[in-house]
């Protein structure tokens, strides 16, 4: 008979626990975890079946602990009933369901009473779990286990008597009294063993302000580490509600620390929480989106737009000048960004030499204080150091490339920079060896594979007659430099890029002293400026010092805005040519060399197509490296039509300008397939 009773009790325990686990897994979305323990107590008739309120099976050690300490099962039943009833009070929105299931819940209090011994003050933190879900699970477990109860009549009578007694109790709902019994060393050891055998699960509420609190449910028997206490503490229902809605108080922080200490000492593994996994997955997705932001651009290598002679960015330009890249028609850089191309506008000297501008362009991209070089500064008589750039691509190094697009003189500047990166500056290297000191990494060379492509728009690769016949005249230089001197005062935002020559008033310097100092500058007699570099002599010197890089894609775009005169072979400016260029266009149109006459107002077609001493070919759909790919000449396009500065020109429309730049940018993206060293 005893064997049969033991079998029935075991069957009831396994059946009830299995159903309870399935129910809680279904209702809590996989957040509740259960553990099953079998209880074999020999011939004792006081063996009871423990049904966990959160889904955990009570262990045999806990039953021994309860029996050894002479726990009054009836009193534990009443205390647990009070706690469950208080759960119902806190969850008012589930009040109706709890009332219907309350009686069935009381029937199982006999089996669950052993859990109440270790209930602590922080039990209220776990009341965020829906009590109706727990009651429903217990109800199903009890109903399915009734058949097993019949097998043990004596056990059933004890359970029925306890249920009848509990059903008639008048349960208080205004306060919850909790006791913390003192424990001796053996009790503490037993309690520690119980905690080790009990699984921990985390419950995350889904709605309201409860979502802000992460609740750790240790099942009622291991809610908090049990410590000897002398006083009883009574919590009202209103206090429980306030604790749920208010921010965490220092006392709660202490409780949490105690719980963490218990977990640490017990070495209990915390089971994965589904809700936490979902939040972590979402966070990873968000992070992925953030990282992918750079990947949204069509171009892997950023595009850097390099302005030409007398070019400015909007923050330092004279107010009479239009926006360089797009004029009043459009903002080219911004339009490229909006259409998926990463692009920048370089800010370098407007009237400096190609060498000085190339050094500035390097630091504009890389970042840092401009170092023109000790040897160069000593040779031409200007300051060695210039302005400091923040840098748009601080990680710019071999393998990390950029596309360089230069308009007018900007194309020459780009070529000079590429030469310095690849081969360095022999004069600077020798000077540093002789005199010591620092040397810029730019002048050391061996910095290949930092440029993906070089594209030039109306660049005077071979110089221009406009500079030979007018631009480089002493009178013209004097006028321009005087204007630069005037704008160099300390109250002006305009920057001509000639500070290395002293054309910038110092903070504590009077304007009179500034003018006197500028008169002594070597700028007035130097060739280290843009006026000279744009002459055919200066351009030829640059061509001798530079070479083609076999790893770079080169391409040129050329415009033409003149036509043949009726009675001669001279070229005359078109009616729609940018008005300031009419004079220079006609001047170039009557040059001695007939092949130089066709021009865009400033630059001859023959000079814009390619350097005379370097290889070239007609551009096709096939992308080639290490050779100038010359695109067909764009007729009726003057020098500024490539950048849209002529707002009065009705022939060249905004849509046409936009299409040109979109095609150019798309072409740059295609070149990355043949210049990407990572794929090669």
Swiss-Prot record:
GO terms for molecular function: metal ion binding; triacylglycerol lipase activity. The keyword ATP-binding does not apply. Its EC number is 3.1.1.3. Residues 82-259 are annotated as: Disordered. Its main location: secreted. Residues 84-111, 224-234 have a biased composition (Basic and acidic residues). Residues 125-138, 162-193, 204-223, 235-246 have a biased composition (Polar residues). Keywords: Calcium, Hydrolase, Lipid degradation, Lipid metabolism, Metal-binding, Secreted, Signal, Zymogen. The active site is at 408 (nucleophile), 600 (charge relay system), 639 (charge relay system). The lineage of its organism: Bacteria, Bacillati, Bacillota, Bacilli, Bacillales. PANTHER family: ALPHA/BETA-HYDROLASES SUPERFAMILY PROTEIN (PTHR34043), ALPHA_BETA-HYDROLASES SUPERFAMILY PROTEIN (PTHR34043:SF3). This is Lipase 1. Residues 35-290 form a propeptide. Residues 1-34 form the signal peptide. It comes from Staphylococcus aureus (strain Mu50 / ATCC 700699). It is found in: Secreted. GO terms for cellular component: extracellular region. GO terms for biological process: lipid catabolic process. Ca(2+) binds at residues 638, 641, 646, 649. NCBIfam families: lipase_YSIRK_Sa, YSIRK_signal.
